Amino acid sequence: MSTMALHRTASTKSDTTMACPNGLVKNLPLGGNTKCSACGSHRAEKRRASSTSSVSTTPTSPSFSEADWSPLHNSSQEPQPEYTKVANSLMRAITDYVGHLQNENLPMPSLEPAADAHGVLKHPEGVAARNAVVELAQRIVAMTMDPDMNLLISSLQFHFCSSLKVAIDLKVHEHVPRRGSITSSELAAKVGADESILVRIMRALILKHVFCSPTPGTYAHTAMSWCMMKSPDAIDLLGHRLDESFRASSRQADALALVNYREPDEADVKGFSMAFGTTENFWEVLGHEGEEERAQRFNRAMRAVSLNTLDVIPRMYPFDRIRGDGLLVDVGGGLGQVARAIMGAHRGAGLRSCIVQDAHAGDDAKKQPDVMEANRKLGVELQKHNFFDPQPVKGASVYFLRHIFHDWPDRACVKILKQTVEAMGKDSTLLICDQVVDDEASPQATLYDIDMWSLFGGKERNRSEWEALFRSADERLYIKKVWTTAEAPTTMLEVCLS
């Protein structure tokens, strides 16, 4: 019998309800006493049920019965084991999360391969509820599994990455139908692989819910595998992660041992340089003749990253209220994808013009005349510039650096900052779009940090690390405000001169 069935509670009709003081259940019939049937508490608050509906800003109750989610509990009020406490917390977090989804008219979580399977939560409380579900579910798994076996299985997760790369190389995702399924023999024939090889690869992916097997010997898409069909750039992002990042991470321990486990510097060997047998950094390798396809794939991968926040960034900061000459300088901004989004949303009121600087701006722009035309229409000018060199544009209203600093170790970041500060006027603003990692970092931020570290010697920084970085560059730099959004895992640091 399922846990849900074991702990299903009976409900009785009553015009009087109570609210559990521990927040386990929102509405419970009193049934003649004031004891909460979920937690056993006698301190429940009575309230008269009303037939009139009202609008509330708090999450609505889920449409399913609350009784179905009564937590595991001991009605005698004996101390609960930690395992049971975590289980109760998980059930409450799921209920809370469902309420937020319903309030924002978002679909319920599912593994079905719908293009819009997971909507974007706009309220931070909903994001926090979702994060709580994930964290508590992972904790339950860790507590449930044998610790020796759990550690061993965790140490073998790199095999999932290699299996995913094989599937992408074979374009398996393109041959599995969005609806319905395909047999292993049919799929093997379409991708040009031995059926036995394909079966073993798919077995590893299905463990992580990338594809599924509705019946033995058949495969179908899940929400995760369908993500590979939604955007060609997303495939390039996975390709980059499963190639350069994967290989760099495999040698990161060796690279750290060579520098005696200290913070990396620009000249230090990195996991990437050891994996690729070079003394050059990532950017230098991508500039070599013969590495054009790798460089193009990386550019497409970064375009996929940009798309995740492209519509969010213009709303994160009041660009229409910037002071001074109204000039925004997008330092290291590629060909202007983000700058165009900002100018398209805010040009005219405060923000008047934009210069996008990039080390390869001129060469790359010549190959994409449509991009040049789009920039021209929005008042975006391209300028060839290396951010380690003196900043040629003086006294601009805003110097905007997006996803720059996490690519570099501290000493290199100080150089970039010093060149920028030298050009700033007294009213100039330095806007840095990067992560400000919480002290208890999310899994995403933690893994991004290791990714930046092994590839570039870079890092994701918390607030105190950002403040130390600014002090090292110029004592006058201070954080005026940190702008955040629930819609994307990115942050905007507004930095000024005192």
Swiss-Prot record:
Q: Annotated region Disordered: where?
A: 1-23, 42-83
Q: Which domain of life is it from?
A: Eukaryota
Where S-adenosyl-L-methionine binds, per the record, is at: D358
Q: Where is this chain compositionally biased, Polar residues type?
A: 1-19
PANTHER family assigned to the protein according to its UniProt record, in alphabetical order: O-METHYLTRANSFERASE ASQN-RELATED, PUTATIVE (AFU_ORTHOLOGUE AFUA_4G14580)-RELATED
SUPFAM superfamilies reported for this sequence: S-adenosyl-L-methionine-dependent methyltransferases, Winged helix' DNA-binding domain
**Coiled-coil region:** none
According to the record, what induces this protein's expression? Expressed exclusively during fungal penetration of host leaves, the time point at which plant defense reactions are triggered.
| Family of the protein in this entry | Belongs to the class I-like SAM-binding methyltransferase superfamily. Cation-independent O-methyltransferase family.
List its EC numbers. 2.1.1.-
Name the Pfam families for this protein.
Answer: Dimerisation (PF08100), Methyltransf_2 (PF00891)
Q: Which InterPro entries match?
A: COMT-like, O_MeTrfase_dom, Plant_O-MeTrfase_dimerisation, SAM-dependent_MTases_sf, WH-like_DNA-bd_sf, WH_DNA-bd_sf
Q: Where is the active site?
A: H406 (proton acceptor)
Q: What is this protein called?
A: O-methyltransferase OME1
Q: Where is the composition biased (Low complexity)?
A: 50-65
